[in-house]
A protein has these predicted regions:
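Periplasmic-binding protein-like
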Residues: 29-30, 103-108, 182-220, 239-245
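Ligand-binding clefts/hinges and TM-proximal coupling segments of bilobed small-molecule sensing domains
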Residues: 136-150, 221-245
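Bilobed "Venus flytrap"/periplasmic-binding protein-like clamshell domains
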Residues: 33-50, 112-146, 160, 175
Length: 245
């Protein structure tokens, strides 16, 4: 029989090694509150690691400008990107999409011009000067023929364009824009309804991690089926799942 000390050490090592050997993937994150925040209590701060854990992985998020994040993920500097629309692999061939949506984004217009008509689609913004975040490909493509596009690197710069009256409208996620407006007391900024477009958002991994794509998709489906996804949404988001204020 092994001495008790040796046995305890072996058991201790056995409990440490699996955790230490779990692969960690670093993904770029272009989200803001209420999806992700500095305290890591946002919806995607919680549902992302939950899915990765079920797939036998650890997730660490870093926040880079959207365009740089895509380039770095495609180059393998980071291991992927947390939320992008389908089709990114067409222009970033080293990225592989996890074929189970992570979340829905409602791309919306915000303005402090009270004379603007309500947009029902991207074409309604084409006669305007519009601010968008560099690297948000859906906005870059749909507004390519707009009167003028002003590109910025982050949400603070985006809404500053409105404050300085440099643009007629900006495009952002509906939920994140509403949170930002409330948090920063932007009383003159209004959300234009309905949203320009609702799109499914997906995790992308660099092709060197292709073996994790199927397990991650299965893990996402599992946490939706067992109620974990809906519970984390209720606990983290100020708006009902599939709804809004």
């Amino acid at each position: 029989m092994l001495p008790r000390l040796v046995l305890c050490l072996m058991l201790g090592w056995g409990s440490v090694l699996p955790a230490a050997s779990v692969p960690e993937l670093v993904l770029n994150n272009v989200n803001g509150p209420p999806y992700t925040n500095a305290q890591q209590t946002g919806f995607l701060d919680r549902v992302g690691p939950a899915a990765f854990h079920r797939a036998g992985l650890r997730l660490r998020l870093v926040q880079l400008p959207a365009e740089r994040g895509l380039r770095d993920a495609n180059a393998g500097i980071e291991d992927g990107d947390l939320t992008r629309i389908a089709g990114m692999e067409n222009n970033y061939p080293n990225l592989v999409r996890v074929p189970e949506k992570l979340v829905d984004w409602r791309f919306s217009a915000f303005t402090n011009r009270h004379d603007l008509s309500v947009p029902a689609h991207w074409a309604s913004l084409l006669p305007l000067t519009v601010g968008i975040i560099r690297g948000w490909k859906i906005a870059e493509v749909n507004l390519a023929t707009a009167k003028k596009i002003v590109l910025v690197d982050d949400v603070d710069q985006l809404f500053r364009l409105l404050e300085k009256h440099r643009v007629d409208a900006v495009v952002y996620s509906r939920e994140m824009g509403l949170w930002y407006r409330q948090e920063h007391g932007l009383r003159d900024v209004q959300l234009l309804e309905p949203p320009l477009e609702s799109r499914e958002m997906f995790i992308y991994l660099h092709k060197k991690h292709v073996e994790h794509v199927a397990p991650l998709a299965a893990a996402l489906r599992a946490i939706k089926q067992d109620g974990t996804y809906a519970r984390l949404y209720r606990d983290s988001m100020p708006y009902p799942l599939g709804g809004g204020p």
